């Protein structure tokens, strides 16, 4: 009994367990052979069905088959299994990406149902061969042929990795069967075939019944060998892909690796029970194929000539052939109806289809295939059994060799028409074109499968002519008739095989090209899947990172909002402190203005003092005249006057020394006061600069919050500054008018001199206290400035972080730019008006400066003139005093004798000179200089007891009057002395009172003069400070105007950027519409693909093959979205980094400037504090200075 050894196949990955294997429409074409029966039934001598019809699942009357059919069935089963392996491999690739082995084992049944195939466990696609092992001797003929179709279920595996070869084929050996009616069974090695597509099921020519199959002619063999040369079109055999897609143009590049070989029949070896495994190889040269075919035919003829068929009628009597044989004979062997190829048959059935017309233009063979339209396919030689009893020749036998050739020519001509116009290289086609070709081939195959089903149903009906033609009578003939019968049958079999080979060659070439192409497309699809999975993983990681970053940014934004609120609170506190400092400065300015008014009043009183001095000089002239008259009467008093004059010189020297010291002290005080005032002005200016710096910092913060508020605040500040300056100017005008009125009424204020002096002392004390307060205030301001510096440093740090998010707020602010533009226009108009006002103020300031210069020059000239007059008057006085002293000295020389008497008699009680009053100006000077010099001893002045005037009065009374008569002279002298004593006492008293009043007036006038000079200097400094303030205000306005212009430019640039962004948005919208259209197109294409794939599926199977397309489309969409998101996030991050860097640089520059300004302010405040500490005690009594010291401390 024959056995078939199955070696392991390995194909594409198997589907997962639990999932039904998907079945393509062409899977239904691989139907079961009809020669399957139980072991008890006998097989016929030869079958009336061809291997192609057996492959379609057609049955004869009995379930037996001939040896020829057995061998043909073995060959077709091998090719169909190759095809089914590749189809199952694609189907399983659609379900999972991991490769799992398949084990295709077709189950052969006697009914025309579809074959169920299992899964092959391996995956290496190596080609193994079938080895037929002879059964033990004595078995019956039906056991030989009946199975050994069951064992044909175990199939050969096909190598996809290398070309097939036939040099290393395993030779199948057939042992002769021991029996009465069989001579031997010759087994010829089966030649390899290509992986045949289902087209060979349709185009293989069926042989005639056994009586006609034994006739063979040399012409058919020669035609067969000639067709081999034309059929050697190369094709690639290393890639097998699904059978559901068959029609694509073959590639010339892929066709270069295909070779065809035949086995040399001389290498056949007959053995019993042997089993060998070899690899398969195709022939490479057409000459070898011709010689091999001729050798094959000769070997068959030699074997058949030695064999006999004794009992063919008996076997035919057991056979019940069906009507399918006659139908096949009609289709393939009749003269009226020629054999057609499957595409021609499809064209005949679907002649009105538009799709077929498109396929005619698109699906056609290249020029190489058109030239090689008729080719030979290597086929397996049949194991022929011979009988001792030859069968009788049939009357109704028909020779199908000619009709078979005609059908082949017809089919090749039709395939040439259908396969013309294709490009030679499939790799040049796009993916869309390949998909369209696949869809069209699927439609063709679907229609083909349906028509094949119809054909099978038609062939299932028995026909009496085929039944009559296939019957044989058990009659014995001579050896010559048997040999002729065998030759006829072999000739007819050769013709049928030649026709099938020609048709199959064309189908194999196309299927091989298609399989290789589909394998490449699957490789690309796998690569796309891997890339998509990698991109999806990357996108998932990127999305996770983005979400983490967003969470961190939200937390940081909340913290920054809290810090921003704290910064706002601190800013409010700083503004409050600034307002308090401005209030203190306003109070200080008011006090300074009061002090200036008081000094101006003192100037008026000084002028009055000058008039009084002139009156005093006139009175002194009158007194000198009276003294000359009295000198004649007071000759006796010259000696006393001389002594008094010496004492008076001593007093004069002391007085001049005191005056010089007082002048030096006053000059030092004036210098110190000037320095203090200058330092105060510098401190005020620096304080203003600090306030300006703070205003700038606050302005920058407000610019981040909103530029509109900053402009309004700056406008309000400028308005308040202008109003304050205008008020100051009005006050100055009013003060000037008041000074003029006070100058007119200065005569009325002479009576209030003492009270004014008291008020001056009190005001000095108040000023000292105020200076101390101001020092304290400056200290407090310094501490607050340090605190504000720390706060500003923190705020700057906070601003560095808040400015990152200020950009996001700026995006919202872009919407408000329209309103801001209107406001900016209005502010520009207001600023232009204010610039005009500032220009007018510049003119007024220049006029005021000119007036100040003129007044200062006038005052200096007046002061110089006054000093010259005073010096001249003092010179005259000194000359008069010197003349008086000389006159008295001459008189004293003449009367030296009377000096002793004057010294003895003039001894009245002396009085101590009173200490200088603290309320006088001299007392204040002495108390101020007490720390530097020791207290000087009191010196007798003009009105004291030690002065010369008192002694003169006493001496005059004792002066005797010399007369010729002693008694008369003594009486007259006594009378004269009494009169002189009374007169001298009166004169002395009047002189002392006048001198005292004059001394007081001189001291008061000197104090007033000094005070007025100080006032003038203070007024001049105040005016200079005001001028500087105005200049600074103008500079600030110019700076503000420049800053506003820069802000306007920036806003214009932002507006232009917005316009550009709007254009970009329009372009983006257009791109979005284009993308939506392309997306709709892609959706329609995916729907069509899904429907096409769903159409491929069997109605009994679940639609699982379209899931991978949906997954791929979804993955590609997700990858595109994530890629766009990643690019957007990257661009936004770069923009934020650039903005952050620019803001950071600006803030660092501002911080550096603010640090410098704060250092300057600290130095200024420290310098002010030191200078205020070095102020003399006279000025320390001012309350404002004391308050300032307290503030600074």
UniProtKB/Swiss-Prot annotation:
Q: Provide the protein name.
A: Sperm-associated antigen 5
**Disordered: annotated span:** 1-48, 96-117, 390-416
Q: How does it assemble?
A: Homodimer, with a globular head domain and a long stalk. Homooligomer; the globular head domains associate, resulting in aster-like structures. Binds to microtubules in the mitotic spindle. Interacts with DCLRE1B/Apollo. Part of an astrin (SPAG5)-kinastrin (SKAP) complex containing KNSTRN, SPAG5, PLK1, DYNLL1 and SGO2. Interacts with KNSTRN. Interacts with RPTOR; this interaction competes with RPTOR binding to MTOR, resulting in decreased mTORC1 formation. Interacts with G3BP1. The complex formed with G3BP1 AND RPTOR is increased by oxidative stress. Interacts with OSBPL8, PCM1 and CDK5RAP2.
Q: What GO molecular function annotation could you give as one example from this UniProt entry?
A: microtubule binding
Q: Which organism is it from?
A: Homo sapiens (Human)
From the Swiss-Prot or TrEMBL record, state where the protein is found.
Cytoplasm; Cytoplasm, Cytoskeleton; Cytoplasm, Cytoskeleton, Spindle; Cytoplasm, Cytoskeleton, Spindle pole
- Per the record, the major location class is cytoplasm
Tell me where in this chain the PTM Phosphoserine is found.
Answer: 12, 14, 43, 62, 66, 135, 159, 334, 341, 353, 362, 974
What modifications follow translation?
Phosphorylated by AURKA.
């Amino acid at each position: 009994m024959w056995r078939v050894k199955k070696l392991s196949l390995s194909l594409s990955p198997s589907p997962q367990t639990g999932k039904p294997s998907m079945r393509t429409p062409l899977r239904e074409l691989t139907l079961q052979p009809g020669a399957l029966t139980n072991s008890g039934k006998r097989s016929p001598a030869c079958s009336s069905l061809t291997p192609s019809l057996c492959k379609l699942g057609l049955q004869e009357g009995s379930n037996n088959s001939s040896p020829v059919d057995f061998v043909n069935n073995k060959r077709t089963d091998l090719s169909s299994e190759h095809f089914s392996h590749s189809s199952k491999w694609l189907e399983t690739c659609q379900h999972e990406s991991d490769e799992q082995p398949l084990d295709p084992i077709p189950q052969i049944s006697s009914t025309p149902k579809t074959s169920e195939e299992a899964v092959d466990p391996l995956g290496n696609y190596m080609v193994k061969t079938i080895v037929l092992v002879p059964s033990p001797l004595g078995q019956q003929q039906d056991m030989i042929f009946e199975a050994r179709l069951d064992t044909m279920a175990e199939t050969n595996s096909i190598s996809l990795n290398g070309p097939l070869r036939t040099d290393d084929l395993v030779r199948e050996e057939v042992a002769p069967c021991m029996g009465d009616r069989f001579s031997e069974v010759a087994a010829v090695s089966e030649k390899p075939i290509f992986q045949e597509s289902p087209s060979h099921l349709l185009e293989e020519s069926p042989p005639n019944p056994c009586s006609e199959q034994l006739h063979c002619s040399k012409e058919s063999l020669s035609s067969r060998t000639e067709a081999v040369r034309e059929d050697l079109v190369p094709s690639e055999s290393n890639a097998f892909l699904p059978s559901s897609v068959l029609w694509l143009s073959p590639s010339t590049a892929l066709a270069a690796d295909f070779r065809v070989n035949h086995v040399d029949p001389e290498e056949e070896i007959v053995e019993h029970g042997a089993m060998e495994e070899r690899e398969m190889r195709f022939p490479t040269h057409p000459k070898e194929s011709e010689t091999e075919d001729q050798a094959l035919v000769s070997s068959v003829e030699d074997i058949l000539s030695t064999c006999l068929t004794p009992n063919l009628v008996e076997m035919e009597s057991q056979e019940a052939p069906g009507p399918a044989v006659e139908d096949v004979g009609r289709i393939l062997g009749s003269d009226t109806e020629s054999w057609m190829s499957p595409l021609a048959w499809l064209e005949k059935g679907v002649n009105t289809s538009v799709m077929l017309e498109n396929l005619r233009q698109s699906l056609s063979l290249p020029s190489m295939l058109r030239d090689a339209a008729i080719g030979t396919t290597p086929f397996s030689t049949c194991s022929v059994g011979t009988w001792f009893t030859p069968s009788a020749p049939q009357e109704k036998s028909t020779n199908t060799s000619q009709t078979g050739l005609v059908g082949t020519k017809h089919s090749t001509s039709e395939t040439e028409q259908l396969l013309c116009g294709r490009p030679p290289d499939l790799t040049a086609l796009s993916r869309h074109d390949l998909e369209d070709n696949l869809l069209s081939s699927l439609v063709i195959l679907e229609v083909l499968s349906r028509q094949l089903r119809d054909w099978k149903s038609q062939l299932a009906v028995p026909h009496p002519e085929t039944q009559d033609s296939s019957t044989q009578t058990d009659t014995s003939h001579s050896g010559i008739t048997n040999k002729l019968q065998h030759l006829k049958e072999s000739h007819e079999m050769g013709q049928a095989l030649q026709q099938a080979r020609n048709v199959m060659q064309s189908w194999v070439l196309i299927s091989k090209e298609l399989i290789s192409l589909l394998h490449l497309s699957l490789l690309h699809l796998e690569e796309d899947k891997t890339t998509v999975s990698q991109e999806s993983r990357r996108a998932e990681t990127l999305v996770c990172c983005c979400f983490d970053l967003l969470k961190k940014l939200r937390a940081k934004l909340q913290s920054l909002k809290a810090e921003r609120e704290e910064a706002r609170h601190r800013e409010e506190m700083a503004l409050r402190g600034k307002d308090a400092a401005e209030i203190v400065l306003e109070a200080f300015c008011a006090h300074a203005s009061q002090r200036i008014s008081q000094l101006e009043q003192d100037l008026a009183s000084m002028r009055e003092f000058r008039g009084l001095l002139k009156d005093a000089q006139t009175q002194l002239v009158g007194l000198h005249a009276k003294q000359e008259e009295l000198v004649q009467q007071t000759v006796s008093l010259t000696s006393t006057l001389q002594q008094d004059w010496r004492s008076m010189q001593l007093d004069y020297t002391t007085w001049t020394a005191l005056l010089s010291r007082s002048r030096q002290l006053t000059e030092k005080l004036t210098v110190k006061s000037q320095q203090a005032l200058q330092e105060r002005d510098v401190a005020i200016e620096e304080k203003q600069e600090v306030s300006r710096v703070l205003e700038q910092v606050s302005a920058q913060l407000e610019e981040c919050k909103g530029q509109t508020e900053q402009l309004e605040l700056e406008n309000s500040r400028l308005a308040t500054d202008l109003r304050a300056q205008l008020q100051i100017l009005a006050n100055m005008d009013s003060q000037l008018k008041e000074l003029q009125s006070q100058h007119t009424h200065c005569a009325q204020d002479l009576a209030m001199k003492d009270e004014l002096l008291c008020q001056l002392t009190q005001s000095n004390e108040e000023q000292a206290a105020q200076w101390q307060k101001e020092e304290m205030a400056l200290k407090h301001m310094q501490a607050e400035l340090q605190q504000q510096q720390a706060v500003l440093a923190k705020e700057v740090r906070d601003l560095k972080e808040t400015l990152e998010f200020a950009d996001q707020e700026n995006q919202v602010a872009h919407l408000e730019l329209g309103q801001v533009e209107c406001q900016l226009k209005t502010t520009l108009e207001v600023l232009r008006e204010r610039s005009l006002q500032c220009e007018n103020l510049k003119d007024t300031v220049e006029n005021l400066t000119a007036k100040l210069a003129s007044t200062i020059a006038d005052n200096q000239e007046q002061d110089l003139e006054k000093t010259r007059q005073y010096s001249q008057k003092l010179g005259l006085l000194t000359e008069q005093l010197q003349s008086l002293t000389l006159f008295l000295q001459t008189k004293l020389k003449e009367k030296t004798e009377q000096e002793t008497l004057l010294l003895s008699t003039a001894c009245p009680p002396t009085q101590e000179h009173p200490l200088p009053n603290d309320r006088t100006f001299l007392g204040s000077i002495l108390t101020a200089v007490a720390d530097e010099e020791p207290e000087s001893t009191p010196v007798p002045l003009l009105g004291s007891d030690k002065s010369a005037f008192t002694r003169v009065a006493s001496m005059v009374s004792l002066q005797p009057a010399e007369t010729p008569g002693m008694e008369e002279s003594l009486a007259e002298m006594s009378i004269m002395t009494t009169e002189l004593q009374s007169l001298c006492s009166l004169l002395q008293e009047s002189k002392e009172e006048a001198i005292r009043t004059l001394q007081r007036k001189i001291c008061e006038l000197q104090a007033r003069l000094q005070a007025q000079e100080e006032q003038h200097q203070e007024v001049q400094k105040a005016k200079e400070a005001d001028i500087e303030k105005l200049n600074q205000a103008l500079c600030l306005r110019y700076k503000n105007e420049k800053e506003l212009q820069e802000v306007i430019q920036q806003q214009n640039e932002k507006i232009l950027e917005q316009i550009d962004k709007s254009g970009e948005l329009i372009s983006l919208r257009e791109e979005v519409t284009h993308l939506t259209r392309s997306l709709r197109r892609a959706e329609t294409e995916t729907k069509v693909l899904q429907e096409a794939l769903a159409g491929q599926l069997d109605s009994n199977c679940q639609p699982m093959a379209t899931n991978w397309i949906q997954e791929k489309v979804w993955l590609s969409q997700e990858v595109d979205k994530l890629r766009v998101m990643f690019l957007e996030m990257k661009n936004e991050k770069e923009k934020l980094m650039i903005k952050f860097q620019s803001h950071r640089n600006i803030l660092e520059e501002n911080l550096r400037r603010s640090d410098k300004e704060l250092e300057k302010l600290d130095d200024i405040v420290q310098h002010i504090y030191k200078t205020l500490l070095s102020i003399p005690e006279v000025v320390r009594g001012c309350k404002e200075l004391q308050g300032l010291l307290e503030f600074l401390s």
